[in-house]
Amino acid sequence: VGTRNDKNDFYAALKNFLDEISSCDVLVVLIGRPWEQIEIPCQTITMMSYSTQEISETLSVSNAESVNIFSLTAGIAELLSTYDTSISFEENVKVALHINLPFYRLMSNKMCKCFRTPESYNTLLYAMANGSNRISELAMFSGYPKNKCDKYIKTMCEFGLVRKELERNGHTKYYPANSYIALWYKTLLTAVPNADGTYSEDVYERFMRSFNDEILSAFYKEMCAYWLDKNITSISTEYIDTKDLSYRSVKVGDVIFDFAYEKKRAVYAYYDTTLGGKLTQKLWKEIESSTTKNRPFYENEYIICTVNRVPDSFWTLSKHYDNVHIVALKSLFATYNKEDNRRMQPRFVPSFV
């Protein structure tokens, strides 16, 4: 109803209908995108994706596997229902990569149902998934005029397919709304299936690289940022707004810190969020060298969050220096699971859950 020109007529007709059948036991259900407030008494029921904690409890899996599953499915019930806990996560991915199974069909079918010409929208979503995130970049990639791109993007935002982020310079970037959409467009839109509907080992490997290096890493970065937000007051006596974008992704010397606050007492946070990576002495020397050029070591607070095994040398650093804080994966989960973090996790509109 949202953008229809005759919505007032629709609501008036609905009210008349309800008045006429007021003596009957009739239930009217309106299904669709988020509804505006209407004058007719009603109850709003919102369908939301599963959180990582709900996945862990429902499927009886570990914290780490629940994050894997959430990052793969975006917590969508239709996709979660196909997950087989008796086999490994990797085997589940291989099974899911088939053109006749829900992981492929859900996105394809919904685009056809939502849009008369899904190809135009597919082009923009594919561009977003591959790094073209500003209107100018999307226009250049697609060949569409900027006003046409803007119109398409606005529609996709309404359908819950695209989210927008404001950069520190005031510009807006657009991204696929959740991890499932991002993975689908990054790896499957242009992939050619085998004759039996499966995908080759090369496609699977590209899928897993994108999953580990981009999707999963981004989720763990959010966990690290959440830990910092909840623990910053125990580290610094100054008030620090951890959500201030000017403190995010700051290059200091040769190191890009995920968070850097350089005032009276500096706080530097580095997030090691790619599985299989590791913290090295070379990295620590670069961190120390970059942050002590203009101020002494003891005036800095260092926070190293990692999803990988913490080397003994880094534990030794944290024991010797009060201003070096090592945050292992177990601690990240302990903080993250203290409360429901739905607000941090992407939502899907009702028609897509």
Region annotations inferred by a language model:
Residues 95-253:
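Accessory nucleic acid-recognition modules appended to NTPase machines
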